[in-house]
C-alpha cells in the first residue's frame, strides 16, 4: 500500500487507502486465503481484522512477520538465495530461480520479483502443482502483447527503449532501482505528469526522474485529468 490516488474521492492518506483496499480481503470467505505483503505495516495491521486464512510474501526471508508467521506453521512466499520459494513452517520448496522468470528482467527488477512472489503464493494456495506454476512464470513475457505499458523493452541496433506506465513515486523508485543495474552510456527519459495526482506527487516523480536520467523530455498526454499542460509542466520543472 503506497502513495497513489491520494487526494481523490476522500482518500487523503495511506490509512484511508488501506481501509479502501482492505475491503477486498475482508470479503474473503473463512476458508479462503488473503495474500499479504509482510513488509507493509498497513497490510500487517489489516491482517488482524480478517476472518480468513492469511499467507504472507516478502523479499526478505528474515522479515520478523515471516519468521513469526512460519514459526506457527504459517505459509509464505520468500525470495531466498535468488529463488522464488514457498515456506511452510520449517519446510521450504523452491519453485523457480528469479533469473529464469522473464518478468524479473534477469532478476534486476525487484518490484517484479515481489509481484511474482504474490502470484506464486496465490497459485500454490489454490492447489496448483509446482510444475504448473513454473510453466507460466517462464513463458509470461513483459511485452506489448502480454503486459502492454509495463516494462516493455524494445531492442534496436545501438539502443534500447523501455516503456512503462509508472505514474507515482513508488513506481518511479522501482524504475530507478532497475535502471541502476542497467549499463548504458546515456539514459534519456520521456516523462509526463498525471493531472489528478497531488502537487507533491508530481514534484517527487520529477525529482526521481532527475536522478535517474541524463536527459529528460517532457511530453504530456492529451488527457490531462483536470489540469492544464502548463500547470503540470510547471510542477515537473
PLM regions: where:
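P-loop/Walker A phosphate-binding loop and immediately adjacent motor/lid segment at beta-alpha junctions
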Residues: 23-32, 52-53, 176-183, 189, ...
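Cofactor-binding loop segments of dinucleotide-utilizing enzymes, especially the Rossmann-like FAD-
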Residues: 1, 59, 192-194, 221
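Flexible active-site lid/hinge loop adjacent to a nucleotide/diphosphate
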Residues: 1-56, 61-63, 169
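C-terminal helical cap/extension that packs against the catalytic core
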Residues: 205-237
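Acidic-glycine-rich active-site phosphate/pyrophosphate-binding loop
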Residues: 75-101
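Beta-strand->loop->alpha-helix junctions that form or flank phosphate-binding loops
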Residues: 51-80, 136-140, 152
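Nucleotide phosphate-binding/pyrophosphate-handling subdomain across enzymes
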Residues: 94-215
Amino acid at each position: 500500500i503506497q502513495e497513489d490516488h491520494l487526494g481523490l474521492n476522500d482518500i487523503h492518506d495511506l490509512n484511508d487507502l488501506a481501509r479502501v483496499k482492505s475491503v477486498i480481503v475482508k470479503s474473503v470467505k473463512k476458508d479462503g486465503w488473503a495474500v499479504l505483503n509482510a513488509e507493509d505495516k498497513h497490510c500487517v495491521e489489516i491482517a488482524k481484522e480478517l476472518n480468513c486464512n492469511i499467507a504472507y510474501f516478502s523479499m526478505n526471508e528474515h522479515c520478523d512477520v515471516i519468521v513469526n508467521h512460519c514459526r506457527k506453521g504459517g505459509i509464505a512466499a520468500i525470495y531466498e538465495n535468488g529463488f522464488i520459494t514457498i515456506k511452510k513452517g520449517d519446510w521450504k520448496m523452491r519453485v523457480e530461480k528469479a533469473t529464469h522468470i522473464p518478468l524479473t528482467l534477469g532478476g534486476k527488477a525487484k518490484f517484479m520479483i515481489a509481484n511474482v512472489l504474490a502470484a506464486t503464493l496465490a497459485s500454490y494456495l489454490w492447489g496448483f502443482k509446482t510444475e504448473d506454476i513454473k510453466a507460466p512464470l517462464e513463458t509470461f513475457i513483459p511485452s506489448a502483447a502480454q503486459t502492454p505499458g509495463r516494462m516493455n523493452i524494445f531492442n534496436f541496433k545501438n539502443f534500447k527503449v523501455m516503456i512503462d506506465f509508472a505514474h507515482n513515486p513508488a513506481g518511479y523508485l522501482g524504475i530507478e532501482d532497475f535502471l541502476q543495474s542497467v549499463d548504458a552510456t546515456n539514459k534519456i527519459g520521456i516523462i509526463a505528469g498525471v493531472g489528478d495526482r497531488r502537487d507533491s506527487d508530481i514534484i517527487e516523480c520529477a525529482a526521481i526522474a532527475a536522478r535517474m536520467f541524463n536527459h529528460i523530455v517532457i511530453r504530456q498526454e492529451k488527457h490531462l485529468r483536470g489540469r492544464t499542460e502548463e500547470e503540470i509542466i510547471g510542477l515537473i520543472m
